[in-house]
Amino acid sequence: MVLSAADKTNVKAAWSKVGGNSGAYMGEALYRTFLSFPPTKTYFPHFEFSAGSAQIKGQGQKIADAVSLAVAHMDDLATALSALSDLHAHNLKVDPVNFKFLCHNVLVTLASHLGKDFTPEIHASLDKFLALLSTVLTSKYR
């Protein structure tokens, strides 16, 4: 999947609107993932799974940092996310389907917070971007 110039512009615009809330929003998306897909909790046995948990907020910030890195390097995601892909494939052994679950909840969370700025075009571009990000993160499983 290739992102068009319009997709890249839309993703950058949406992520800039997220701004300083990126960690909180990604923490919320992770929390939604845990609620919607309980088996995803198995990767975090030490977490407190309540809303506002410090562990979920901390992991949310890590996710936000990874998304920010991906947004900044959309033209070479494979290189930018290589270490993260290695970590998830070889060390953490995260089931690849979990990336799709999280990406779905990222879209839900961003839609709920961006309101009218979450246009159909932004939605489509973010969906493509997150699918590409998931593909890169699971590329080392093969």
UniProtKB/Swiss-Prot annotation:
Modified residues (N6-acetyllysine): K17
Modified residues (Phosphoserine): S4, S36, S50, S125, S139
BP-aspect Gene Ontology terms: cellular oxidant detoxification; hydrogen peroxide catabolic process
Residues annotated as binding O2: Q59
Modified positions (N6-succinyllysine) in chain numbering: K8, K12, K17, K41
Keyword Secreted carried by entry: no
Any GO MF annotation of the entry: heme binding
Binding site for heme b: H88
SUPFAM superfamilies to which the protein is assigned, alphabetical: Globin-like
Domain called Globin: residue spans: 2-142
UniProt modified residues of type Phosphotyrosine: Y25
Tissue: Red blood cells.
Keywords (A to Z) from UniProt: Acetylation, Heme, Iron, Metal-binding, Oxygen transport, Phosphoprotein, Transport
Gene3D superfamilies given in the database record: Globins
Function text: Involved in oxygen transport from the lung to the various peripheral tissues.
Subunit structure: Heterotetramer of two alpha chains and two beta chains.
Family assignment from sequence similarity: Belongs to the globin family.
Protein name (record): Hemoglobin subunit alpha
Species of provenance: Monodelphis domestica (Gray short-tailed opossum)
